[in-house]
Amino acid sequence: FRRAALIFPCARGISRSAGAGIPGNPDDHVLHGIERRENYVQGGCAADTVWCAASALLELFPMAARRLDYLGISFGGGIGALALPWDERFHRAHLNVPSFGHHPLRLALPGVGSGEAVRRYQQRTGRAWATLCSFDAAVAACYLRIPVHVAAARFDPAVPPPGQFAIYNALAGEREGGLARPARLAGPGAQSEILAQDGGVVCVNTERSW
């Protein structure tokens, strides 16, 4: 990044944002508040890592408003797709192996990420869908009109690839896609690259499997 201000927010319940009665374990975190749409943790995570993060960055570096971009990987990619359509301050986005896309498919596909905890919860209780239908990144992507680059994986045991491609296919604005190898499979040092000049970037990553 050249001449760019970056902010790396921590979603509530995770890492330095641990606490407030929200479990940090990925399998428990993704189920927190799922009984009611108004209480589901993903809504708060969207506010933390996109809207509030952008406000904090722009308060410190107001000149970044002319070029505010978003970079999200896995969990951050899905949260970005959920939240970006409702924030007009962003100019571009890069979503790498984005999660939370096409929940009807996600609930039918076994995996090793915390999405598996959601799938099992739905199988056991039948109560997840009423909330999840309001937190589908592929549905939200239908309203995302800024230019977006998506790096989706054809194989990903943690984030089902059909959900990743569903987000890309649903994008309403200019889009560009590429194939990605998930960082959790590519080894140390693997990362996405995005160029930013004279602007601000909100970056959201996680080393956990979501």
Feature map (PLM): residue ranges:
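Gly/Ser-rich "nucleophile elbow"/oxyanion-hole loop immediately N-terminal to the catalytic nucleophile
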Residues: H29-S74
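Active-site nucleophile elbow and catalytic-triad environment of alpha/beta-hydrolase enzymes
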Residues: T125-A140
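Short beta-strand/loop motif that positions the catalytic acidic residue
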Residues: L144, V150-A152
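Short alpha-helix in the alpha/beta-hydrolase fold that links the catalytic acid
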Residues: I146, P160-N169
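Acidic catalytic loop of the alpha/beta-hydrolase fold
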Residues: R154-V159, L185
